């Protein structure tokens, strides 16, 4: 990939952090409680040639336990909300980068790479865009201007950008977002070209959920990505969100990742969590550990799978219970920031 040098440089920083991380080990409550003191997730992933990341709520970085786990256990951080459109450009031409800047500063201090999320998405879109009444030419310019400002602001600071997010319905049809209905499918290529112009250093990704296995939706994604590549659109990677259900890791996950890799693309597990019916018990937690390990193993078996990001650190702060009533316990750390069996499952699968 033409941006490989940037990622390689980040990898060198991550490897260098291993010494620092080892020195912290006895002060890291997550590692002490897990009983797995040979390595952190960060060290184990680096040794395997991959990154391991987490979504970060920049407002929680003032919590020292949260910040310490983020710093010591992960090599990549994704902005949970701080880089989304409703935050970065709540009104036209008025930009707010404070949350994203805090995340980049935290990443720089802890030798993390930064994964930008997301430039164009149908959700968390401010009303002035959603209901602006723009025609196709106008909305395309609004989108390009937004990408130019946001990706341009962080240019050279990020390893990856989710350029477009969740463009498909589950049946493989195009989601009827304001961009799709107004501009047409070409908005996707336009967004990638704009992102490439604004930040030629970041790897540019398309990201979606329920595309982990081979199904109508992932087939549609595969066809779209193939078409973009045929058009010479600067796309570098495919993000598989991987918001999974206990015991339901797709059996063809590895095969699915490999077919995207065979197109010459990187593949990233971008938003991994594995939810269960509450309350959690020892049996469910053991199954969850197996599931997390299965995802890591699938990634490790596909050389183009560059890394795995979990969607949040602790069950305390997870999005899952608010969206799926009666379900939760989806993260690797529990509500008290203690590591669950899933931690050791991931660590072992990484080779730690």
Question: What are the residue ranges of the model-derived segments?
Answer:
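Short, acidic/polar
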Residues: 57-73, 140-150, 216-228, 253, ...
């Amino acid at each position: 990939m033409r941006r490989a040098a940037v990622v390689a440089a980040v990898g060198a920083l991550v490897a260098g952090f291993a010494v620092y991380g080892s020195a912290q080990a006895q002060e890291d409550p997550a590692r002490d409680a897990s009983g797995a003191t040979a390595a952190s997730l960060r060290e184990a992933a680096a040794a395997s040639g991959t990154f391991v990341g987490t979504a970060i709520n920049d407002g929680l970085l003032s919590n020292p336990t949260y910040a310490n786990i983020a710093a010591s256990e992960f090599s990549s951080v994704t902005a949970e909300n701080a880089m989304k459109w409703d935050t970065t450009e709540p009104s036209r031409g008025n930009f707010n980068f404070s949350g994203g800047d805090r995340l980049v500063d935290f990443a720089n201090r802890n030798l993390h790479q930064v994964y930008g999320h997301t430039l164009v998405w149908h959700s968390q879109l401010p009303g002035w865009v959603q209901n602006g009444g723009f025609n196709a030419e106008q909305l395309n310019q609004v989108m390009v201007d937004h990408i130019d400002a946001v990706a341009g602001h962080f240019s050279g600071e990020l390893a990856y950008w989710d350029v477009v997010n969740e463009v498909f319905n589950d049946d493989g049809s195009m989601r009827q977002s304001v961009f799709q209905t107004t501009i047409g499918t070409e908005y996707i290529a336009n967004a990638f070209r704009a992102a490439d112009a604004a930040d030629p250093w970041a790897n540019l990704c398309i990201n979606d959920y329920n595309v982990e296995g081979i199904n109508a939706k992932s087939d549609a994604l595969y066809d779209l990505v193939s078409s973009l590549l045929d058009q010479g659109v600067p796309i570098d990677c495919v993000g598989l969100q991987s918001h999974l259900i206990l015991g339901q890791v797709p059996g063809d996950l590895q095969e699915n990742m490999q077919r995207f890799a065979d197109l010459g693309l990187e593949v990233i597990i971008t938003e991994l969590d594995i939810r269960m019916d509450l309350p959690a018990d020892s049996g469910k937690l053991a199954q969850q550990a197996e599931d997390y390990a299965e995802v890591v193993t699938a990634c490790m078996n596909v050389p183009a799978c560059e890394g795995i990001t979990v969607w949040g650190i602790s069950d305390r702060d997870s999005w899952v219970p608010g969206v799926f009533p009666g379900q939760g316990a989806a993260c690797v750390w529990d509500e008290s920031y203690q590591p669950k069996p899933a931690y050791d499952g991931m660590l072992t699968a990484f080779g730690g």
